[in-house]
Amino acid sequence: MSWLLGRNRQQPQPDQTAGFSEGGGAADPEGRTAGEKSGDSQLSRAERKAMEAYRFDSSALERAADAAKTLERSKHAREALELSKMQEATRQTEYNTKVKEYEAHIEQAKVEQKRIDHEERRKTLIEETKQQQQRAQYQDQLSRKRYEDQLLQQQRVQEENLRKQEESVQRQEAMRRQTIEHEIEMKEKNRLKLLEHELRAKARVDRENRDINLEKIRLKAQEHRTTVLEGIKTAGTVIGAGAEAMLTDWDKVLTAAGGLSLLALGVYTAKGATGVVSRYVEARIGKPTLVGETSRFAFLDALKNPLHYLKRLRAKPTDALQGVVLNPKLEERLRDIAIATKNTRINKGMYRNVLMHGPPGTGKTMFAKKLAEHSGMDFAIMTGGDVAPMGKEGVTAIHKVFDWSHTSRRGLLLFVDEADAFLRKRSSEKISEDLRAALNAFLYRTSEQNPKFMLVLASNTPEQFDYAINDRLDEMVEFTLPGLEERERLLRLYFDKYVLQPAAAGAKRFKLDTFDYGKTCSKMAALCEGMSGREISKLGVSWQAAVYASEDGLLTEKMVLDRCYSAAQQHKQKMAWLSDQERADHKSITGTAAPPLTLTAKKL
């Protein structure tokens, strides 16, 4: 900066360009000579632009010199110098800072490079490990393949050896069979030859003894003829003498006639008495063919199960609705029927006929049995489907059932299940003559009230009954599907019967996990919508099956809910299988339409 401030000034150099100007000619304002101008005129525009880049413009230096002179003459020259020094120091500091930053960036880059190298090395090691594992797996596969090939080869060798052995055995067996066949053939030939020789010898002997044999036959026939004639003569003589003696003695004639009359009377009397006794025994001791189940004493059944009959004789009347879960209004009505039936038996009044209709599995048969036990009556169950196969014997069988019912001293509750099978409408239904005759016999035996038996009919489709059957009914009770509260009560009942009681009894393979039974039953009651009481009871049996099928014999909440969900799905599937006619019948029975074909169920 000293040259700017005027220090250490040197002498001005002589202007060398002047000499060049003088020797080369006058210069133009741009400092170019005439030779240059002439040369430039000969150059192209691109060449001229390239030449202008190497030319020096001294005007900038002149302006800098003028600025330096102005600065030296200024009174603030020292402050400007200090300011320039400070600016220079600041720039130096900034430069050093940038250098440090660059060095830090370089170090960071080195660290990053090392990290990348380590990462690459780690990836390389992982890849090498993977490659080694793949090679090991490949080697293992190869070894397994070789081992399998060896096993296959050994198996083929064994099969080949076995095949050869079987072929050898077959050849030996064939040779043995051929040997045996040859022996049999030779024996047969020998036997035929021997038989031929024997027959020839016998024929030769017969030809030689022909006269002797004919004489024997002639003598034998003559003797037989003489014997037969003598027997006929003797029998005729005896019979003639007896007839002559009887006809001449009237006392013997009367005695013979009386004996024959008594013999005929005894035969026919024994035959009639046997029929009467057999019918009496059948009515008092046995049971009719149509009756499938009864609580009346049967001698043969008592011999088979004596303990069962002793327990039944000692049993006391129970509540008619014990163990039966129904709608409260329906329970109230059934209880009234049970009380009225019991008082009717006590007072020897006339029993009323009852029709119980509704979906299957809603407790109709169970209530009929409970009603008979509560009233102290005997019960008998017959199925309407058993009448049609009997054909012409159906009328006789129905009369036997009612005759048998009249012989009960305690009163009989006759329960006809699936009664619509043979009590159909005679006008619209196409029924056979035998079934029509059986229906007429049933109508004849139920035309009046009876103090000996009570008739209870059960049907899923009561609209198919003949009008005369409806006229003989005094009470019609509809059994509906259980509601939410009834389902929960049923679930609690069967959970106690099939789960809690066996678990409390200490069964070997029956353990119960700890969970909230009441809450679980409430959940299942919501899931079992549309299910009947029978289906819910089968659900209880499925819980036992789940315990017996498990490894540890422990019943958990999950197992209970899974079985319930499966039962609900099966119920929906059964409903989906119904035809259009069955869906209409289902709607008429339950009052609700069957579910759609799609199976959707909310899982607990």
Swiss-Prot record:
Residues 1-50 are annotated as: Disordered. ATP binds at G358, P359, P360, G361, T362, G363, K364, T365. It comes from the Eukaryota. GO terms for cellular component: mitochondrial inner membrane; mitochondrial nucleoid; mitochondrion. Residues 8-19 have a biased composition (Polar residues). One of its GO terms (molecular function) is ATP binding. InterPro entries: AAA+_ATPase (IPR003593), ATAD3_N (IPR021911), ATPase_AAA_core (IPR003959), P-loop_NTPase (IPR027417). PANTHER family: ATPASE FAMILY AAA DOMAIN-CONTAINING PROTEIN 3 (PTHR23075:SF0), PUTATIVE ATP-ASE (PTHR23075). This is ATPase family AAA domain-containing protein 3A homolog. It comes from Drosophila melanogaster.
